[in-house]
């Protein structure tokens, strides 16, 4: 039962943070950020927020710095929409899975093109 409640809270946090980043954040360091997952601890006091940032490593670093600085603002805004006693402490972590998936897809396409070029006609 508690696991289901934490999963529901994680999904609600993910949805609300995505809205806040899209509509409320005005920090120019914040690039194109997608929230890929949220994990809430069993007691609901801590949440790991996994973000994917489009761009190079400096864009990722700038976005991480902007998110870290905005953590207090984001928690305050979450407290207005979440119906919980304690709003979790937010920790933003880079999620490189989308970037890795794109790289693998590109490598597979290159291999396929290379095989087509070498095939006898």
UniProtKB/Swiss-Prot annotation:
One of several proteins that assist in the late maturation steps of the functional core of the 30S ribosomal subunit. Associates with free 30S ribosomal subunits (but not with 30S subunits that are part of 70S ribosomes or polysomes). Required for efficient processing of 16S rRNA. May interact with the 5'-terminal helix region of 16S rRNA. GO terms for biological process: maturation of SSU-rRNA. Pfam families: RBFA. It is found in: Cytoplasm. InterPro entries: KH_dom-like_a/b (IPR015946), RbfA (IPR000238), RbfA_dom_sf (IPR023799), Ribosome-bd_factorA_CS (IPR020053). It comes from the Bacteria. This is Ribosome-binding factor A. GO terms for molecular function: ribosomal small subunit binding. Belongs to the RbfA family. Keywords: Cytoplasm, Ribosome biogenesis. PROSITE patterns: RBFA. Its main location: cytoplasm. One of its GO terms (cellular component) is cytosol. Monomer. Binds 30S ribosomal subunits, but not 50S ribosomal subunits or 70S ribosomes. SUPFAM superfamilies: Ribosome-binding factor A, RbfA. The gene is rbfA. Transmembrane segments: none annotated.
């Amino acid at each position: 039962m508690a696991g289901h409640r934490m999963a529901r809270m994680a999904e609600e946090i993910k949805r609300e943070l995505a809205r806040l980043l899209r509509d409320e954040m005005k920090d120019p360091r914040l690039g194109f950020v997608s929230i890929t997952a949220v994990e809430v601890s069993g007691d609901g006091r801590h949440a790991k927020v996994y973000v994917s940032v489009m761009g190079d490593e400096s864009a990722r670093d700038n976005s991480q710095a902007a998110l870290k600085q905005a953590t207090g603002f984001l928690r305050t805004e979450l407290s207005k929409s979440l119906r919980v006693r304690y709003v979790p402490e937010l920790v933003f972590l880079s999620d490189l899975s989308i970037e890795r998936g794109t790289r693998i897809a590109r490598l597979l396409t290159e291999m396929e093109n290379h095989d087509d070029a070498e095939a006898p006609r």
